[in-house]
């Protein structure tokens, strides 16, 4: 008897079935499931396949597209005879099976393959139609009902897999309310490749040869992805960057959210040079929302192709079977902008020996049926249509060049990318539609700058932190024109998270023109990297930034043409408002001198110098002159007092700031002392224990005497 393991394959019979074998209407697959425990007879019997007079326990795998696979040779269990099982079969058992002449044994393949499901009729290429599964607007693309799925019997070792419906791709991408934020995610991935030798990232517009539609290209010449990393990139939650100190990625979700926010489909080409004696590889992956919706898939499946360099040619890496390979090729060609495998491989010729090339197509449209991305307004830029684009701001940007980034970053990718990173690695280029993006530091747009060091307070005394943030605050150079430009650019690990964060929403003109820059690595960015997680640390930072802006504004606003801030009135009637601009809302500028009771007295005493009740002659003139001098002296004293009070208030503010800083330093020092004290106490206890052990050891020694 042949010792090789074979699995029966059932074939479709003609409508005229032999006696005892009913006809079937479609191709069938034996759906096998077994436990990993060989001792469990019930589970073994449930996964048996008859081979001759023996039964083979088989384990079902899952193929690339979510279906059942054929038998995996590595998972074939031991051959079990009926005698070993102690099972007696009734007479005529198995009579309903097809005759042996119609059953052909095939060798079990070592990898997963597809279920033999009849393929649906090929729909027209989605890029040529006016709709994608019913809608091309991003915010409405999730409004569809897929086929009701009831096939939940697939399991692994008795545990059910959590299934991910294709609609999750859309709902996951809604975290990006702002489309330009999705570009930033892809640029982050390219910038992280600097460690692998990347020197550029290119963002451009391409035209689809199939439908003539426009597509997005993001390409870098970094280290690329091998087949394993490509699969992690297409999966959810895999992130090797979360453990790296200088990278911002941590959720393993940015590629999926960003690409699906910009378009319905994305195809990725990546070439990875060989390392540690391994051959070079190149991979193609297709993540297509259009494909998943149009074919009624209930799980996210990703067609992929892998190649390996075997000099001088590239050879296919067949992970399961040739049939699977052909199925992946057909699917990618049908649902991608390319018409043949040769066209697919030509994309690797454009990236030379390494790198990653991402093409996003079936771009989303707005309510008017136009692309959400505007490629025509500027041939060297990619801009947004809709509410983020304000013609008034565009006109003001040409008048006030130092405020240009504040006025245009919401709709212009070139403007946003120029301030996206606090520092650009030397020699690294960001190329947007053929022209390099010029890196811009917002500090260059500022005047009368001040530098303040902010140290966050530690959450617990047991944790000592050396984190701090240097805040550079000042007026924008266009502030003298009283443009409403204000806010802080807050970076995290070199990446802009909050552009021009407006934290002081004062009425009137208070706070105008004040901008700042800081890098806060002690706060955690949110899921979309367009904000921070609301924590106590962030609340303290926000409160401190508000205080900085108020103090800077009240101290320096008169230098750019605004009125000096008024003070609270004291018990003596003087105007002595607090220096906080909250107490002053766009009013008269100078210090007002109240009219004291003495003025009213003299005015009533001398209503008319020539009247009957007035004082005439030399005495009257002398009194008038003395009165005038007293008034001038009083006014001068009031001004001096007011200036002195203003200086006192400013000194009070400075003193409060110093007290707060000293308090934070004291708390930090106390925490450090407590930690050191505990460590010293532990060390002392350890020493005492060691001494006691030494004494016990010495005492336990029995002296030996020679007789």
Swiss-Prot record:
Compositionally biased tracts (Polar residues): 590-613
Keyword Nucleotide-binding: yes
Residue ranges, compositional bias (Basic and acidic residues): 1-11, 575-587
GO CC terms: nuclear body; nucleoplasm; nucleus
Short name of any one Pfam family annotated for the protein: HATPase_c_3
Sections of the chain in a coiled coil: 620-701
GO BP, sorted A to Z: defense response; DNA repair; gene silencing by siRNA-directed DNA methylation; positive regulation of defense response to oomycetes; regulation of DNA repair; regulation of gene silencing by regulatory ncRNA
Protein EC: 3.6.-.-
InterPro entries xrefs: HATPase_C_sf, MORC_ATPase, Morc_S5
UniProt note: phenotype after gene disruption: The double mutant atmorc4 atmorc7 exhibits a pathogen response phenotype with abnormal up-regulation of several genes involved in plant defense.
Annotated keywords: ATP-binding, Chromatin regulator, Coiled coil, DNA damage, DNA repair, DNA-binding, Endonuclease, Hydrolase, Kinase, Nuclease, Nucleotide-binding, Nucleus, Plant defense, RNA-binding, RNA-mediated gene silencing, Transferase
Enzyme type, top EC level: hydrolase
Motif window: Nuclear localization signal: 633-640
Similarity remark: Belongs to the MORC ATPase protein family.
Subunit relationships: Homodimer and heterodimer. Component of an RNA-directed DNA methylation (RdDM) complex. Forms homomeric complexes.
The protein's role, per its UniProt record: Exhibits ATPase activity. Binds DNA/RNA in a non-specific manner and exhibits endonuclease activity. Probably involved in DNA repair. Involved in RNA-directed DNA methylation (RdDM) as a component of the RdDM machinery and required for gene silencing. May also be involved in the regulation of chromatin architecture to maintain gene silencing. Together with MORC4, acts to suppress a wide set of non-methylated protein-coding genes, especially involved in pathogen response. Positive regulators of defense against the oomycete Hyaloperonospora arabidopsidis (Hpa).
Name of protein: Protein MICRORCHIDIA 7
Organism from which the protein derives: Arabidopsis thaliana
